[in-house]
């Protein structure tokens, strides 16, 4: 309450739904620097996240978007960022596709800004990909040992953490796990 929110969406079809929630919608692309700059100009804080719309290499796409985020922040002069990252962002290329978050964090961390990296664990919703084996075998099949414990998070819990990071800023660079 009391904050103006602008959201960059790639879909004109979502504008009415976004604005019904109380945000101002701007149609554009996170892969277009001009769209990012126009959306972020005048903002006190930016919430940035990588979407799943990569074509080709997720890591190459993420690096490109991370560089665009960095350029947009430099251009607009924003001094406070909350970035949705991922568990594993502190790891190297051996982590696989999650390495993209290491790259993005590195790019953003190089800026002289206050930034909070929000690192959620696995999403509950991703379990839907295992629904067939859950129904047929009463099991979730993964490529790690059965003794491995996995933590899951619900998007609403991530949202609460992001809102808290926006409303209660901390100076410097911080990491919050969800």
What spans do the regions from the language model cover?
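Oxidoreductase cofactor-interface core, primarily capturing Rossmann-like NAD(P)-dependent enzymes
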Residues: 1-17, 31-34, 41-43, 51-61, ...
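Cofactor-binding loops of NAD(P)H-dependent oxidoreductases
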Residues: 28
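N-terminal glycine-/serine-/threonine-rich beta1-alpha1-beta2 phosphate-ribose binding loop
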Residues: 21
């Amino acid at each position: 309450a009391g904050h103006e929110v602008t959201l960059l969406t790639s879909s004109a079809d979502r504008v009415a739904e976004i604005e019904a929630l109380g945000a101002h919608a701007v149609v554009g692309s996170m892969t277009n620097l001009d769209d990012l700059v126009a959306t972020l100009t005048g903002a006190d804080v930016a919430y940035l996240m990588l979407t799943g719309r990569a074509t080709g290499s997720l890591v190459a796409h993420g690096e490109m978007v991370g560089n665009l985020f960095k350029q947009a922040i430099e251009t607009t002069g924003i001094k406070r960022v909350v970035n949705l990252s991922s568990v594993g962002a502190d790891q190297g290329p051996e982590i696989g596709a999650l390495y993209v978050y290491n790259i993005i964090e590195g790019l953003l961390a190089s800026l002289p800004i206050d930034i909070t990296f929000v690192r959620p664990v696995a999403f509950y919703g991703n379990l839907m990909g295992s629904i067939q084996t859950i129904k047929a075998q009463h099991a979730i099949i993964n490529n790690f040992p059965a003794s491995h414990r996995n933590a899951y998070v619900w998007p609403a819990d991530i949202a609460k953490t992001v809102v808290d990071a926006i409303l209660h800023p901390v100076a410097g660079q911080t990491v919050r796990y969800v």
